[in-house]
Amino acid sequence: MRKPSAFHACNIIFLPLVKCASATIMLN
């Protein structure tokens, strides 16, 4: 079980999505 690796991968995928969503909300 590699929780740190999974958590790191989740951050790599999740953080850009949050930034994109925030940018979309700001544009709207």
From Swiss-Prot:
The chain crosses the membrane at residues 5-27. GO terms for cellular component: membrane. Keywords: Membrane, Transmembrane, Transmembrane helix. The keyword Membrane applies. It is a single-pass membrane protein. It comes from the Eukaryota. Its main location: membrane. It is found in: Membrane. This is Uncharacterized protein YMR182W-A. It comes from Saccharomyces cerevisiae (strain ATCC 204508 / S288c) (Baker's yeast).
